[in-house]
């Protein structure tokens, strides 16, 4: 299994729609010249942006977190360019980018160091072969202070690994429950 370069990422995105929308360079400034947390293609990965759509965890209803029976009332919906995550809590969001993963590729997501160095951890499970959709992002605020997440700016990096052989059964073949997801998607048992 080999990690794929910027050339491969560019070709797959431009010719096959692997990443839409696709930024062919590292974007570091907005149209007004203000500094951003970078996004776009890098040497061996793609830095994704967070959409302005968040679900922030709250325990106002004294719910129990149960992945088999998740209570949607545990979240407050926020639509904003900035999301404040309470101390020792978390939020869900989604990428701006829509992904279509090739059958012979596994994609792994890592958080950006800009957030990690502030105690904000991004968690995403691997994007499996032939999975497609907006990626649901989980941000954990590990600090005792409120933490800020910026929509429209880089939050995590996707790494693409191409296998030497094509898998027998892809995520699409299995009818994966998160196939084609749009928006912030809550757990499904």
From Swiss-Prot:
EC main group: hydrolase
One BP term from GO: dUMP biosynthetic process
Database matches in InterPro entries: dCTP_deaminase, dUTPase-like_sf, dUTPase_trimeric
One matching Pfam family: DCD
UniProt keyword Hydrolase, yes or no: yes
Positions bound to dCTP: 112-117, 136-138, 157, 171, 181
Gene Ontology molecular function, alphabetical: dCTP deaminase activity; nucleotide binding
UniProt pathway: Pyrimidine metabolism; dUMP biosynthesis; dUMP from dCTP (dUTP route): step 1/2
Family: Belongs to the dCTP deaminase family.
Assembly: Homotrimer.
Name by which UniProt lists this protein: dCTP deaminase
Gene: dcd
């Amino acid at each position: 299994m080999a990690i794929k370069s910027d050339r491969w990422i560019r070709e797959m995105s431009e010719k096959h729609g692997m990443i839409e929308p696709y930024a062919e360079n590292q974007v570091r400034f907005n149209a007004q010249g203000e500094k951003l947390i970078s996004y776009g293609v890098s040497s061996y990965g793609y830095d994704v942006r967070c959409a302005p759509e968040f679900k922030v965890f709250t325990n106002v209803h004294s719910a129990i977190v149960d992945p088999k029976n998740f209570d949607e009332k545990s979240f407050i919906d926020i639509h904003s360019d900035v999301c404040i995550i309470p101390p020792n809590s978390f939020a869900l969001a989604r990428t701006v980018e829509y992904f279509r993963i090739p059958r012979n590729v596994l994609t792994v997501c890592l958080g950006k160091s800009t957030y990690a160095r502030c105690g904000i951890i991004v968690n995403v499970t691997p994007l499996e072969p032939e999975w497609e959709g907006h990626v649901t992002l989980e941000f954990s605020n590990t600090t005792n202070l409120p933490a800020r997440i910026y929509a429209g700016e880089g939050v995590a990096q996707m790494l693409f690994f191409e296998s030497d052989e094509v898998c027998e059964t892809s995520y699409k073949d299995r009818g994966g429950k998160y196939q084609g997801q749009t928006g912030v998607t809550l757990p499904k048992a």
